[in-house]
From Swiss-Prot, chain A:
Organism: Kluyveromyces lactis (strain ATCC 8585 / CBS 2359 / DSM 70799 / NBRC 1267 / NRRL Y-1140 / WM37) (Yeast)
Protein name, entry field: EKC/KEOPS complex subunit GON7
Keyword annotations from UniProtKB, A to Z: Activator, Chromosome, Nucleus, Telomere, Transcription, Transcription regulation, tRNA processing
Comp. bias (Basic and acidic residues): 44-58
Lineage: Eukaryota, Fungi, Dikarya, Ascomycota, Saccharomycotina
Subcellular location: Nucleus; Chromosome, Telomere
Pfam families, per database record: Gon7
Bias-annotated ranges (Acidic residues): 108-119
Subunit description: Component of the EKC/KEOPS complex composed of at least BUD32, CGI121, GON7, KAE1 and PCC1; the whole complex dimerizes.
Family annotation (InterPro entries): EKC/KEOPS_Gon7
Swiss-Prot record, chain B:
Species annotation: Kluyveromyces lactis (strain ATCC 8585 / CBS 2359 / DSM 70799 / NBRC 1267 / NRRL Y-1140 / WM37)
Family that this chain belongs to: Belongs to the KAE1 / TsaD family.
Protein name per Swiss-Prot or TrEMBL: tRNA N6-adenosine threonylcarbamoyltransferase
Cofactor(s) this protein cannot do without: a divalent metal cation
Subunit description: Component of the EKC/KEOPS complex composed of at least BUD32, CGI121, GON7, KAE1 and PCC1; the whole complex dimerizes.
Listed PANTHER family: TRNA N6-ADENOSINE THREONYLCARBAMOYLTRANSFERASE
Length: 119, 385
């Protein structure tokens, strides 16, 4: 089964997002960045809207003795991790835009706000 | 001439099947309906008599803690995480083993909150590609109207559409649902919900329902708390009323004895309760709605009113509207219960299937882009004369 991947392209940078199935971040359907918002949780919200757990195949793998997840569940877990990677990358980009650390960054922000990166 | 049998059902069956996906606000609804092929629909304006059979009407609501509204991001997350489970449940309830038998997939194209709309349309597109079934994008308001007409059998009513996001008085004319009057600022449901937040009463089953229950407990019904009455021609404004009653409620909670409306200036005795405020707010807002609805009825010479939208299941609103209609000659009020008043997938399926049967459906996925702003009168109503 080929692994899902994503590419970010902008005029000034590109970024590849790859999945490593052995990394725990690609082995869950509960993403770090796709949970209920902190604000709602602080107000006492009981989160009953979590994604369903990944589903295991009925038979345990005879060679490894380890439970296997269904193909669709594997894809869901990998996409959850991939979505986290993308969200974190874009959040970092936004934070970078929000807080200029020097005049060069300030110029970059102004360029972005002008929409000049889009042209 | 309208021909509702223009497109034959799949597999040369004698009935149509449609699935509707709704998620424009905090309710996620999936509905499956069946329309028999009837000869009378080949050349007639009988779109309110489809003999609809509801095979499934599943809904799940995103509920927040008392005092809180629903944020777009969290509402979208709710829809994203539940949509597959709700669709599966609907198919099971409808006893549909092979979903490729469905004629059309209908989804809410707008108006509504952007992020939740996006989540649901992605599910609709995926199903369409997976099962090779055409899509129809539905205007949420038109969905409410068509479901109301089908359930009540109201032929050509003046429609009062009252919900958390919309307040409109509508009448049909020349292939459009024309808006006769509407809110100039916030919707009536929004006004009630936000007052419920100020009172910190629960959001389950819905804040408006809880206000209605409190209003029923009012022991001082003959003495209304005076609130602004803001009808502007055929339109109304509710943000000022909300601001005013919010201030009263806050003064009540703070025990601000200086407020002479709430407390006796000499003895400090409390004159008004939370229940009184809820009752007066409802009476005031509903009286405004009745006034503009009656004027619209006079304009179009109609004696039928159809109340749709979430606020439409408020029994007091139905009573007040019935009183007005009784005073007019042979007037009738048509309303539905919470299964169809509150946002649901069935209404999207109903309006979408009518559109599909007249030969209108999505030819390219670029036509499925959802929109937050989508006025009722933008839709061409092909299924009516």
């Amino acid at each position: 089964m080929s692994l899902p991947h994503a590419t970010y392209t902008g005029p000034k940078s590109t970024h590849e997002f790859e999945v490593d199935p052995s990394d725990p971040r690609y082995q869950t359907t509960e993403g770090r960045t796709t949970g209920a918002s902190d604000y709602v949780l602080k107000q006492g919200h009981q989160d009953v809207d979590k994604p369903s757990d990944p589903k295991k195949v009925d038979n345990v793998n005879s060679k490894t003795g380890i439970d296997q997840y269904t193909t669709l569940s594997q894809l869901r877990m990998q996409l959850t991790g991939l979505q986290d990677d993308i969200n974190e990358y874009l959040t970092e980009k936004i934070n970078h835009v929000k807080k200029p650390r020097n005049s060069k960054q300030e110029q970059e922000i102004n360029d972005l706000l002008d929409g000049s990166e889009e042209t | 001439m309208v021909n509702l049998n223009g497109i034959p059902p799949r597999g040369k069956r004698n009935y149509y099947l449609a699935i509707g996906l709704e998620g424009s606000a905090n309710k996620l609804g999936v509905g499956i309906i069946k329309h028999p092929v009837l000869e009378k629909h080949e050349d007639s304006d009988l779109s309110y008599e489809c003999d609809v059979e509801i095979l499934a009407n599943i809904r799940d609501t995103y509920v927040t803690p008392p005092g809180e509204g629903f944020l777009p991001r969290d509402t979208a997350r709710h829809h994203r995480n539940w949509v597959v489970r709700i669709i599966r449940k609907a198919l099971t309830e409808a006893k549909i083993d092979d979903p490729t038998k469905i004629d059309v997939i209908c989804f809410t194209r707008g108006p509504g909150m952007g992020a939740p709309l996006h989540c649901v349309v992605i599910a609709a597109r995926t199903l369409s590609l997976m099962w090779d079934i055409p899509l129809v994008g539905v205007n949420h308001c038109v969905g409410h109207i068509e479901m109301g007409r089908e359930i009540t059998g109201a032929k050509n009513p003046v429609v009062l559409y009252v919900s958390g996001g919309n307040t409109q008085v509508i009448a049909y004319s020349e292939k459009r649902y024309r808006i006769f009057g509407e809110t100039l600022d916030i919707a009536i449901g929004n006004c009630l919900d936000r007052f419920a937040r100020t009172l910190k009463i629960p959001n389950a089953p819905s804040p408006g329902y809880n206000i209605e229950q409190l209003a029923k407990q009012c022991k001082n019904k003959e003495k209304l708390v005076v609130l602004p009455y803001t009808v502007k021609g055929m339109d109304l404004s509710m943000s000022g009323i909300l601001q005013y009653i919010d201030t009263l409620a806050k003064d009540l909670f703070k025990k601000n004895l200086k407020n002479k409306l709430l407390f006796d200036s000499r003895t400090g005795e409390q004159l008004v309760t939370v229940e009184d405020l809820c009752y007066s707010l409802q009476e005031n807002l509903f009286a405004m709605l009745v006034e503009i609805t009656e004027r619209a009825m006079a304009h179009v010479n109609s004696n039928q009113v159809l109340i749709v939208g979430g606020v439409g299941c408020n029994v007091r609103l139905q009573e007040m509207m019935a009183q007005m209609c009784k005073d007019r000659s042979n007037g009738q009020v048509h309303a539905t219960d919470d299964r169809f008043c509150i946002d649901n997938g069935v209404m999207i399926a109903q309006a979408g299937l009518l559109e599909y049967r007249t030969g209108h459906f999505v030819k390219d996925l670029s036509e499925t882009i959802v929109t937050q702003k989508f006025r009722t009168d933008e839709v061409y109503i092909a299924w009516r004369e």
